[in-house]
Amino acid sequence: MNGGRVLLKSVSRSFFLSINFLPGGMKEAVSVAYMLARAADSVADTAKASSFVRLDLLRLMDRVVTGIADRDECRRCFERLGRDLAPGQTHEGERVLLQRYGECVAAMNALPAEQISLIRKVLHTIVEGQIWDLEFFGDGHEGTIRTPSKDDVLLYTYRVAGCVGEFWTELASLVLEEHFSVLSREEMLELGRHYGQGLQLVNILRDRAEDASRGRSYISDEPDVLAAWQSMARSWLGEGVAYSSALINKRLRFASVLPAWLGLETMDLDGILDGTTASEPKKKVGRSVVRRLMVRAFLFAWKSPQGEA
């Protein structure tokens, strides 16, 4: 994909930098999968478009990525994204991403068949989660907030994040083979799935006030309920550290453990879980903490792999 690295950098500089630490055989597939997922996320979050329009486009994008769509459907998808959704994006990188969505699909189709299959599976699952979100909450109007059941939230976190942990595991196992992990593939799939769900739970907990202002409430504000979700998030992030500890490849260990530590640091920020108002600036882990964690991750990467947390 011509200019793919530049496009990825414009969409997410932090993700672009983290890609550089991955083993060579994973970089292209992870980059393409990320851009396709980010494009779907941009569509799902475009509040200027009605939920009906977004749902229709997400289903069309799913057909395109999974290879079901014919040539006319593909052309219609690319045209609608570039004409109807891209101009309304406030993020310049996302605007260009939607305009060049067809190139991202072409880049995916140029990958080895096994990698294409993995990307199609994870993107289909992610879009299922985004569709559920839009169908459940609709266009989101303050004052008409619904809260899904625990089972719904768990399924949602799997679809939009847990499946990414599985994708990461399956791709790394495919590329690295016996040099992937000291644990079995099945154990790593479970750890990776929970790791992804834990990261998504951190996002949900952190963004409660902002989501409520958009008519979304994924979890109740009752103290006991919040405490249970917080405990689950910490436990699953701990599984993320265990996942990373079991990896053999040093580059992969470095890239894999950082999000878990950043997630735990996020949960420890003052007031981050107290339901502050949406008008307040979103709290983030400071740069000095990120640098400290990167040094810690570098040292962590050189340790011998461990088969348990």
Per-range role (PLM):
Residues 1-199, 205-309:
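Catalytic cores of Mg2+-dependent Asp-rich isoprenoid enzymes
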